[in-house]
Regions:
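N-lobe entry segment of adenylate-forming
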Residues: 1-71, 75-90, 94, 118, ...
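Conserved ATP-dependent adenylate/AMP-binding module captured primarily in the ANL superfamily
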Residues: 129-164, 195, 237-256, 289-306
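Gly/Ser/Thr-rich phosphate-binding loop
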Residues: 189, 277, 297, 306-310, ...
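Conserved AMP-binding/adenylation subdomain of ANL enzymes
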Residues: 235-254, 262-330
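Conserved pre-ATP/AMP-binding loop-to-beta segment of ANL
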Residues: 53-54, 173-175, 182-216, 223, ...
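Conserved ATP-binding/catalytic segment of the ANL
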Residues: 413-473, 597-599
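Conserved AMP-binding A3 loop
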Residues: 69-74, 203-204, 212-239
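Conserved AMP-binding/adenylate-forming core of the ANL superfamily
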Residues: 33, 57-113, 130-140, 188-195, ...
Length: 600
C-alpha cells in the first residue's frame, strides 16, 4: 500500500498553497487547476452506455434474497430513456421536482437519473420520515415545502399511508401494490414508455446550472433546509476527486453501499463516483443496526468491493465480525483500495482495530484509512486526505478548484469555502441564503479547524468541531464539544453509542450517555461503574475542567428521530437533545440524584 500511495499516477501528492491576509485570516488552495468536467450527470450515463454497455452499473438483492437483480449500462440507459419519456408525457408543472420517499433501489436510481436526464429536479427524502416516524407531520411539511409534481415510493402498502392528509397534489407512482393507493400509477408503466427524440432534445437543453437535485440538510445543526445541487456542482466535485484519487480513471470502482441517497455522502459522493467512472454499485440492504449488519457482512463477503465507504458507527458494528473471522476479513479486504469514513468523527479505538484486522489478514498491504470533509451545500467534498494518516482527526487538504479560508472566531479558526462546487443557495429561502455567505462570497459552513503543521500546510487540516456547538463554563473556559465527544465515546467503547455534553455557564461539564446495545446489555450498576471508572481515570490523569466531565447520566430512551435528535445515518443533533431533555440536564447538574454517575 505504501507504493500505491507514493505512485503519482494513482494518487496525487499532497501539495497546498497558503495565502495570508492582513486581518489575521488565511486561505488554503490546491496548486492543481481544475480540469474540464461533464456538463451534466446524464453525460456519464450516455458515455458508459456507449463505451462499456455490458459493464455492471447496479445490483440489488432479488425477491428470493439469495441472488442479485443486475442492470448493466446498456439496460440502465434504456430504462432511463423510457422513464424520461414517461415524465415528459406527463407534462408535469415546471419547477416541481420528482420526490422519492423510499430506500435505495434500482427503480429509485432509474427514476432519479431519468428526471435529471431531462432537466427535471429530483429529491430523495429519507425513508425514515415515512416508515419509522410515528408522526407524519415532518414528512408532510417537507412535501408542502418541495411542492412535488410526482411522488414515488417502492411499495404503496408501506408508504401510501404516510401520504394521507399531506396536502399536496401530485402524481403518485409505486413499484409494488400501486392498485392499493387510489389514483396511483405502477412504475412498470413508466418503464414501458417508448423513447422518442424528445428525450435527447430535453437532454441537450440541460445546462450546468440546471438544478439536478434538492437535498434536505440533515438537521444536525438546526431546522432542515432545501439545498440546491446543480449539475455543475456535482460534476465538478467528481472531477476534483478524480484529480486526487487518480486511480479512479484506471479502475472502475466496485461498491457495496447502504448509505442513503437522501444524504449527500451516499448520493453525491458514492453514487456519483460510481456513475462518473463507469463502476458498479451493489445496493446493500443491510444497515449498521442489530439484525441488519449481518446482511452487510454477507454482501461484503460475496462482492469483495474495491472501495469501502461508511460512517463510524458502521465500522464499529462491522468490526466484531471481522475480528472474529479471519477468513471473512481476508475476503472483504482482498480487493480493497481504501476504507473511508465521513459524516462523523472516527474514534481512535476504531481506527486501531481496523488497522489490526488488516495487518493480520493482509500483512504486506496495510489498510489505507482515509476521510474527507464537506457538506450537503458543497457537493459534498471540500478536502481530501490523499496520503497515509497516522490516526483520525485530519480531514485532508482542499481539492482542486476550491479555496478554504480560516477566520479567527473566539478561541477557534472558523472555516469557510468558495468554489465551483459550492451551492447557489437554499430553495425559496433568500434570507437563509444571504446568511449562509460572508461579504466575500465564502460559504459559512460552521466548522472549525487548524493546520496540523502551520509551517507545512500540505500536512492537512485538523477538524476542531462545530463553532456553534462549543460553550463556556462559568469560569470562562471554552469546551470544544466535537473533540471531547469523540474522545469520550472512544474511552467508553463499546458501551456508548454517543454522548451529549452539557455545562453551558455552569461550573462543570456533564455528560448524557446513550448506551450502545453492549452497554444496555450490562446491569445498570455495572454500566455506571464503567462510566465512573472512565471519569476517574480522566481526572487522575490531570485532565482540566474543559476536558473532564464531572458527572454523567445514562438515558433509558434512545434518541428520537421524530424529535430530530438523530438522523438515519446515526449521528446526534446535540442542540435538539439538550432542548428536548432539559429536565435530564437539570437532574444531571443537581445534587443528590442517585442515578447521576460521579467519579467519587
Amino acid at each position: 500500500m505504501t507504493d500505491f500511495l507514493q505512485d503519482e499516477n494513482l494518487i496525487a501528492p499532497p501539495r497546498t498553497v497558503r495565502i495570508d491576509f492582513d486581518d489575521g485570516s488565511f486561505a488554503l488552495r490546491s496548486p492543481m487547476a481544475l480540469k474540464p468536467y461533464a456538463r451534466c450527470i446524464g453525460e456519464w450515463i450516455e458515455r458508459w452506455a456507449h463505451e462499456t454497455p455490458d459493464a455492471l452499473a447496479f445490483a440489488e438483492r432479488d425477491e428470493t434474497g439469495e441472488g442479485w437483480r443486475k442492470l448493466d449500462y446498456r439496460a440502465l440507459r434504456h430504462a432511463v430513456g423510457a422513464v424520461a419519456q414517461a415524465l415528459l408525457d406527463m407534462n408535469l408543472p415546471q419547477g416541481q421536482p420528482v420526490v422519492i420517499l423510499s430506500d435505495n433501489a434500482i427503480d429509485h436510481a432509474v427514476l432519479m437519473l431519468a428526471a435529471m436526464h431531462i432537466g427535471r429536479t429530483a429529491c430523495s427524502l429519507s425513508s425514515a420520515y415515512s416508515r419509522m416516524a410515528k408522526d407524519p407531520s415532518r414528512l408532510h411539511g417537507m412535501l408542502q415545502a418541495l411542492k412535488p409534481g410526482l411522488i414515488y415510493a417502492s411499495d404503496a402498502k408501506v408508504y401510501g399511508g404516510s401520504l394521507a392528509g399531506c396536502g399536496v397534489e401530485a402524481v403518485t407512482v409505486f413499484s409494488r401494490n400501486a392498485e392499493a393507493h387510489p389514483g396511483a400509477m405502477a412504475f412498470e408503466r413508466l418503464l414501458a414508455a417508448k423513447e422518442t427524440p424528445a428525450v435527447m432534445q430535453a437532454f441537450a437543453d440541460v445546462l450546468p446550472d440546471t438544478h439536478a437535485k434538492y437535498l434536505l440538510t440533515s438537521g444536525s445543526t438546526g431546522k432542515p433546509k432545501i439545498v440546491i445541487n446543480t449539475h455543475r456542482m456535482l460534476c465538478a466535485n467528481q472531477q476534483m476527486m478524480a484529480q486526487t484519487w487518480r486511480f479512479l480513471t484506471r479502475e472502475a470502482p466496485v461498491l457495496v453501499d447502504w448509505l442513503p441517497w437522501s444524504h449527500t455522502f451516499g448520493a453525491n459522493h458514492n453514487l456519483n463516483m460510481v456513475l462518473c467512472h463507469g463502476g458498479a454499485l451493489y445496493i446493500d440492504e443491510g444497515r449498521p443496526a442489530p439484525g441488519l449488519i449481518e446482511k452487510t457482512v454477507r454482501n461484503l463477503r460475496e462482492v469483495k468491493p474495491t472501495l469501502l465507504f461508511n460512517v463510524p458507527r458502521g465500522f464499529d458494528m462491522l468490526l466484531p465480525f471481522l475480528e472474529a473471522d479471519d477468513a471473512l476479513a481476508a475476503e472483504v479486504f482482498s480487493r480493497l483500495r481504501l476504507a473511508f469514513y465521513a459524516a462523523a468523527a472516527l474514534a481512535p479505538s476504531t481506527w486501531q482495530r481496523l488497522e489490526a484486522v488488516a495487518a493480520r489478514v493482509r500483512p504486506t498491504r496495510p489498510l489505507w484509512l482515509t476521510t474527507s470533509w464537506g457538506a450537503t451545500e458543497t457537493s459534498p467534498a471540500i478536502t481530501s486526505a490523499h496520503w497515509k494518516l497516522d490516526g483520525a482527526g485530519c480531514i485532508g487538504a482542499p481539492l482542486p478548484g476550491l479555496e478554504l479560508k480560516f477566520v479567527p472566531n473566539g478561541e477557534k479558526l472558523e472555516m469557510r469555502v468558495k468554489g465551483v462546487s459550492v451551492f447557489p443557495g437554499y430553495r425559496d429561502a433568500p434570507r437563509e441564503t444571504a446568511q449562509a455567505f460572508d461579504e466575500e462570497g465564502y460559504y459559512r459552513i460552521g466548522d472549525a479547524g487548524f493546520l496540523a503543521n502551520p509551517a507545512q500546510p500540505a500536512q492537512g487540516v485538523i477538524f476542531n468541531g462545530r463553532v456553534a456547538e462549543d460553550f463556556k463554563l462559568s469560569s470562562g473556559t471554552w469546551v470544544s464539544v466535537g473533540t471531547l465527544r469523540v474522545k469520550l465515546v472512544s474511552l467508553l467503547a463499546p458501551h456508548a453509542q454517543d454522548v451529549v455534553l452539557t455545562g453551558h455557564d455552569r461550573d462543570e461539564i456533564g455528560m448524557l450517555v446513550f448506551p450502545s446495545p453492549q452497554g444496555a446489555a450490562l446491569a445498570p450498576d455495572a454500566l455506571h461503574e464503567r462510566i465512573a471508572g472512565m471519569l476517574r481515570a480522566l481526572r487522575d490523569e490531570g485532565a482540566g475542567s474543559s476536558q473532564c466531565p464531572a458527572c454523567a447520566l445514562v438515558l433509558a430512551e434512545p434518541p428520537s428521530l421524530d424529535a430530530g435528535e438523530i438522523t438515519d445515518k446515526g449521528y446526534i443533533n446535540q442542540r435538539a437533545v439538550l432542548t428536548r431533555r432539559a429536565t435530564d440536564v437539570a437532574r444531571l447538574h443537581a445534587s443528590g440524584d442517585a442515578q447521576v454517575v460521579r467519579p467519587a
